[in-house]
Amino acid sequence: MGIVDVGSKPILEREATATGAIRLSKEAIDSIINGKSPKGDVREASTISAIQAVKETPRTLPHCHPIPIEACNVEWEVTEEELHCTVTVRTHWTTGVEMEALCGVSAGLLCAWDMLKPVSYTHLTLPTILLV
């Protein structure tokens, strides 16, 4: 068991995008739109959480390589019933950044869920997360 040897692989431009969503109550959606969550601005805090998770992926997942992250973009979309998060990560390296994008989406949505529990704890559905 160990980390895969990527030392002989060429350095290439790598990009990965992951997306996910949590289903929320109308009260939770309204608190996001109006910026009135008891814990603060949901999208702002969750963006920070997503970026931090991207950067810390190898600390959380021991078989992931520490990768120099060149760019990380976090986007949010609010619909009538869901909060969507999309994280895109870019680098020039010997291995991809799929796990970093997935970790970013996961942490961003979990942070949002944590921040919205006081608003509507029983009407939250945990994230659906996809690598796109």
What would you call each of these model-derived segments?
Residues M1-V42, S46, V54-T57, E70, ...:
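Flexible, solvent-exposed loop/hinge segments and secondary-structure transition points
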Residues T122-T128:
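Conserved small/polar residues in nucleotide/adenosyl-binding loops
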